[in-house]
A protein has these predicted regions:
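Short, flexible loop segments at boundaries between secondary-structure elements
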Residues: 127-143, 270-286
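Short, well-ordered, mixed-charge alpha-helical segments that flank or form enzyme active sites
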Residues: 109-113, 133-136, 144-147, 154-156, ...
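Ligand-binding beta-strand-loop-alpha-helix segment within the catalytic cores
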Residues: 53, 138-160, 164-167
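Contiguous, glycine/small-aliphatic-enriched amphipathic segments in soluble metabolic enzymes
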Residues: 1-121, 164-248, 252-266, 272-275, ...
Length: 313
């Protein structure tokens, strides 16, 4: 059973959910964590059969009513509810009531009103799970990337790129890629221009990244690096030298992924005691409930959750 959190009620999450269900595209057993009022609103707004809302399996959180829904607008009440959906689904996954959870987008600013330290789904779910070491993975047909750090300032990202953390992410990446691809050839991107060029542009590549790569090789992993950041994605996507890239910071991985396949990327959190995948896009307030949101990333996230949880036959 997959648990689906409906995300921010003023964004595209509920629309994507009900449209995917209406189109018969949700093949896996699932249950939604959210509010009945939001489902009913989405069905009505999209001109779908009124009975559809009652047919969608739901763990009704009872947090939002119809007047709370203001499409395209940021709402602190809606942001708080979206976080609570995620927490509820995570607890049920930890209790083995769910095989995996699939999350639809939240708005960080809307959620921070009730959770001042909120920085994203990844960190919230990790907190509920006891804060194990985790990494964000983005995956599409063309590219898989993971991140040593994500939602922090670039100056802080450089500080976080320690040998221990990089090795941790390499291990998590290797384990996940083995379940998704025939091979697990991992490239580790450098942090400085030209991977430091032997210290000419910074020492971190040689003093922090290279030792992690060497240790991963000793553990039997097929790992290369530090690879220059300006060529590693070309060598991965065009030359098929690697199956995944470990990136040192948020934009290093997100820019190539979203350039290659904005609608077809899937986000997964590696290192949790549960399986969690997500769409690789935001709330898109500007098109909420207009019937134009792309459901592809959501369906791929459902598919990946099934594969990672071992439920696929």
């Amino acid at each position: 059973m997959l648990g689906v959190t409906m995300g921010d009620a003023n964004g595209v999450g509920p629309e994507i959910l009900v449209r995917a269900y209406a189109e018969g595209a949700m093949e896996d057993a699932f249950v939604v964590y959210g509010d009945r009022a939001v489902l009913e609103y989405a069905v009505e707004r999209l001109g779908l059969s009124p009975s559809l809302a009652s047919r969608i399996p739901l763990v009704d959180q009872g947090l939002l009513r119809r007047p709370d829904i203001t499409p395209g607008e940021m709402s602190t009440a809606v942001g708080a509810a979206a976080a609570d959906y995620v927490v509820a689904a995570t607890h049920d996954a930890l209790a083995k009531k769910l095989d995996a959870i699939v999350t639809l987008p939240m708005n960080k600013e809307a959620t921070r009103a009730s959770r001042p330290d909120f920085s994203g789904h990844t960190e919230l779910i990790a907190e509920v799970c006891g804060n194990p070491p985790v990494t964000m993975m983005l995956a599409s047909d063309q590219l898989i990337v993971t991140h040593v750090s994500t939602h922090v300032a670039l100056s802080r990202a450089i500080e976080l790129a320690t040998t221990e953390r990089i090795l941790e992410v390499i291990r998590l990446t290797h384990d996940a890629v083995r379940r998704l691809r025939p091979q697990a050839r991992i490239a580790v991107a450098g942090i400085n221009p030209h991977a430091g060029e032997h210290g000419a542009f910074g020492a971190e590549d040689d003093t922090q990244i290279r030792p992690a790569v060497e240790q991963a090789r000793r553990e039997g992993m097929d790992v290369s690096g530090p690879e220059p950041g300006d060529t590693v994605f070309y060598n991965t996507v065009r030359r098929n030298r690697f199956d995944a890239v470990v990136c040192m910071y948020h934009d290093q991985g997100h820019i190539p992924m979203k350039t290659l396949d904005f609608d077809g990327g899937v986000n997964a959190t590696l290192g949790l005691p549960i399986i969690r995948t997500s769409v690789d896009h935001g709330t898109a307030y500007d098109i909420a409930y207009e019937g134009n949101a792309n459901i592809r990333s959501f369906l791929l996230a459902m598919e990946m959750a099934t594969r990672l949880s071992g439920r696929q036959e």
